Design a protein with these regions (language model features):
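Glycine-rich segments within core transmembrane alpha-helices of 12-TM secondary carriers
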Residues: 78, 100-125, 149, 320-333
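Extracytoplasmic gate region of multi-pass secondary transporters
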Residues: 186-235, 329-334
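Multi-pass alpha-helical transporter architecture, strongest
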Residues: 153-160, 304, 354-380
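Helix-to-loop junctions at the C-terminal end of transmembrane segments
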Residues: 20-33, 240-252
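C-terminal ends and interior cores of transmembrane alpha-helices
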Residues: 42-61, 261-277
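C-terminal transmembrane helical hairpin of 12-TM major facilitator-type secondary transporters
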Residues: 253-300
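Cytoplasmic membrane-interface "Motif A"-like loop-to-helix N-cap segments
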Residues: 30-42, 249-260
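Extracellular/periplasmic helix-loop-helix junction of adjacent transmembrane segments
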Residues: 1-19
């Protein structure tokens, strides 16, 4: 039950992502990607600091969990705005023949954040703190580090240049209602939802939930779980730019189809085999295999979605449907998986994850390859 409560708190930030995508997406499309990214990271800094300095329940009672909830809300708003604005910015500054590679590098930062957090935890656990110290106050250190990184990110973003595509489209975009433009592009909004369903559920299955799965279902020790997760994330980081570069050569659609087909056919047997193994090495290889499949989506997700929309609504077009879908199908991965486990039907979650990927496969089948139909140069 404690694991489930923690998962619900984790999901809270996802519920705020759609609102963040609207607020920061509108800001990015009207006033610039750079300013939107600066304010998003400020909000993340405040959210991390609130968690780092939050008093305990014994000190302030009910105000403690309320403070954590507010902090998670701030982080959710920031994450919701960050996705669309950052995916748009990198796609717009990239050379047309290198956008897939840039998209892969962009996803490295998402996985890299989890890898950095895991590294900090390993250092604290093994080198610096005792278990009692970590439980008493050491758990706050990663959030302090996160806040400091946010300050550094703000300093870097302050000196970024606005994209040429935004500056070229700014005058035309100002004459149009973003809501009317979004309505005119409703098919693309639906397409982003379809593209995202399977990918986001798979991503959070093999990242956030996987550590709990390895401990609770596979039966690995804490040390084994940490090492397996660390190695798998490192493997994922290495292959993202490679997959992205491949999409610059053969197009985006083949990679999406590959993820959809292999994910639909392979998720259930892969998770079933993973659950039954007792070997950390086998677990590591299986998760790497999963990443080799999932990366058909993760490595190009930014550029595929960005290429669907004109410049005037690109940040909102990418961010809003993604945030809604991530909240429903990404943020709920842990609660759903833990619910099935608590009911004694853990394989039900395997079928659920398979179904999500199959839904996306239907969209991948009919979508046109965005590399050849890109709207990156369109102002409105």
């Amino acid at each position: 039950m404690q694991q489930l409560n923690a998962a619900v708190l984790f999901a809270l930030a996802f519920l705020m992502r759609p609102l963040g995508s609207v607020l920061f997406g509108y800001f990015a499309d009207r006033f610039g990607r750079r300013l939107s990214l600066m304010w998003a990271v400020i909000l993340m800094c405040f959210g991390s600091l609130m968690i780092a300095v939050c008093p305990t329940y014994t000190q302030i009672g009910l105000a403690a969990p309320i403070t954590l909830m507010i902090a998670r809300i701030l982080q959710g708003l920031s994450q919701g705005g960050e996705y669309g604005a950052s995916a748009t910015y990198l796609s717009e500054i990239a050379h047309p023949n290198r956008r897939g590679f840039y998209s892969g590098v962009w996803y490295v930062t998402l996985i890299g954040g989890q890898l950095l957090a895991l590294t900090v935890l390993m250092v604290l656990q093994k080198l610096l703190l005792t278990p009692d110290q970590l439980k008493a106050w050491g758990w706050r250190i990663p959030f302090v580090i996160g806040a400091l990184i946010s300050v550094y990110a703000f300093w870097m973003r302050r000196d970024m240049h606005e994209t040429d595509l935004f500056k070229a489209a700014e005058s035309k975009a100002a004459k149009q209602s973003v809501w009317v433009l979004l309505g005119q592009n409703w098919k693309q909004l639906v397409m982003v939802v379809g593209i995202t369903v399977g990918g986001t559920s798979a991503f959070y299955t093999y990242t956030t939930y996987m550590q709990k799965f390895l401990k609770l279902s596979v039966g690995l020790s804490d040390d084994q779980t940490t090492l397996v997760t660390f190695g798998a994330l490192l493997f994922a980081i290495i292959i993202q730019p490679i997959y992205g570069a491949i999409s610059d050569i053969i197009g985006r659609k083949p990679l999406l189809i590959g993820f959809g087909v292999l994910g639909t056919l392979g998720t259930y047997p892969l998770l079933t085999t993973l659950q039954s193994t007792k070997s950390p090495l086998v677990a590591f290889l299986l998760i790497c295999l999963a990443w080799a499949i999932v990366s058909g989506y993760t490595s190009i997700t930014a550029v595929v979605k960005a290429e669907l929309f004109p410049t005037a609504i690109r940040a909102m077009g990418v961010g809003i449907p993604y945030a809604l879908t991530a909240a429903i199908f990404g943020g709920t991965v842990e609660p759903i998986a833990l619910y099935f486990k608590n009911q004694g039907f853990e394989s039900g979650f395997y079928w659920y994850a398979t179904g999500c990927i199959f839904i996306s496969l239907m969209f991948y089948t009919f979508i046109k390859d965005t590399k050849s139909t890109s709207r990156m140069e369109d102002a409105v």
